[in-house]
């Protein structure tokens, strides 16, 4: 037979997960019930649900697109909200995550009572980072930044592996600052900002963009590097972009399969031959063929680079230059609409005309 405490927990879970009419959910009676059950946070009801990746999440008036359950716990701990701490633990949050944001002895004692360790080692802190960053919502990214970017446990120099991970993520796109000259706090901030752009989380992008305007061109840099043509288009059309279009193209070429942003820069007037050269320097065969599709003709210069790098695959491709020709179906469209570009260059349907020619010539 269920105990009163388990019945109470079950009742709260049912209330938090049920779907009711909008009219009743806003009624005074229903709101009173939720408040009495402790299902009220930041001026609104708490809802428990799962996202498309089957991850448990918390929603409320302040976090409408959801928080990963453990991130919600860390926020409740920071706010010293005993009721919500106990509630989120009942729903499956890991009490050890609370040690990241605990700031009073009373709440630390509560965490111990609920089974928390005395402290987290560097590997457990790293596990917290991996867990919370997997959840893709604007609310979650913003709160991760606010809770963790200036957190002593995350800033500790003992967390060598975490620092390596952040540095690795930033190093490939840190073109307008020297990584060794900025604090780890700023690196974490730039990392969370980049995640917002990577997953096109528009609310989070606007949050970081307004708050960190002194991070010169960082949003643009991330949009180019992470193939976010939607955000690139918004910036290029609505804001004054201070970066040269050829420098933008070079950034678009730093990752494989960045077809959408490469195409967009090309349509804005970037030099496709320079993009071809960058692709060969990086040994990105997919980008090389895409540049040829867009009419690039820098075969001789690229061949010299490939020979210097002893890049056998690129050499084989480049010596067949007389077989290739621009793909008129790409060039003639001259589109800059992000949605149309992504449809045109969809990963599952787009095939390079010249790559097919090369493969056909090497079939036998």
Curated annotation (Swiss-Prot):
GO terms for biological process: taxis. Belongs to the asfivirus MGF 360 family. Plays a role in virus cell tropism, and may be required for efficient virus replication in macrophages. This is Protein MGF 360-1L. It comes from African swine fever virus (isolate Pig/Kenya/KEN-50/1950).
């Amino acid at each position: 037979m269920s105990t009163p405490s388990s019945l109470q927990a079950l009742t709260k879970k049912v209330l938090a997960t049920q779907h009711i009419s909008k009219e009743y959910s806003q009624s005074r009676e229903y709101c009173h019930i939720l408040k009495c059950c402790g299902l009220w946070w930041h001026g609104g009801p708490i809802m428990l649900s799962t996202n498309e990746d089957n991850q448990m999440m918390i929603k409320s008036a302040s976090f409408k697109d959801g928080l990963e359950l453990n991130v919600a716990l860390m926020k409740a701990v920071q706010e010293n909200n005993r009721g919500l701490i106990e509630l989120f633990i009942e729903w499956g949050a890991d009490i050890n995550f609370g040690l990241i944001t605990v700031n009073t002895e009373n709440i630390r004692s509560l965490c111990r009572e609920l089974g928390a360790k005395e402290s987290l080692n560097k590997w457990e802190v790293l596990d917290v980072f991996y867990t919370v960053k997997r959840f893709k919502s604007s609310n979650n990214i913003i709160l991760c930044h606010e809770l963790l970017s200036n957190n002593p446990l995350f800033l500790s120099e003992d967390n060598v592996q975490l620092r390596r991970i952040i540095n690795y993520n930033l190093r490939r796109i840190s073109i307008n600052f020297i990584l060794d000259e900025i604090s780890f706090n700023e690196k974490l901030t730039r990392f969370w900002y980049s995640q917002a752009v990577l997953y096109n989380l528009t609310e989070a992008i606007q949050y970081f963009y307004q708050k960190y305007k002194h991070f010169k061109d960082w949003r643009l840099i991330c949009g180019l590097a992470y193939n976010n043509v939607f955000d690139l288009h918004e910036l290029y059309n609505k804001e004054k972009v201070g970066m040269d279009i050829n420098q933008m193209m070079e950034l678009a070429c730093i990752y494989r399969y960045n077809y959408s942003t490469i195409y967009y820069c090309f349509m804005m007037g970037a030099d496709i031959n320079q993009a071809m050269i960058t692709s060969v320097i990086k040994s990105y065969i997919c980008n090389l063929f895409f540049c040829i599709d867009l009419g690039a003709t820098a075969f001789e210069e690229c061949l010299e680079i490939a020979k210097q790098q002893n890049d056998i695959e690129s050499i084989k491709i480049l010596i067949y230059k007389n077989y290739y020709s621009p793909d008129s179906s790409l060039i003639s469209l001259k589109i800059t609409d992000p949605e149309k570009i992504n449809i045109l260059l969809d990963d599952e349907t787009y095939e390079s005309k010249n790559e097919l020619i090369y493969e056909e010539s090497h079939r036998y």
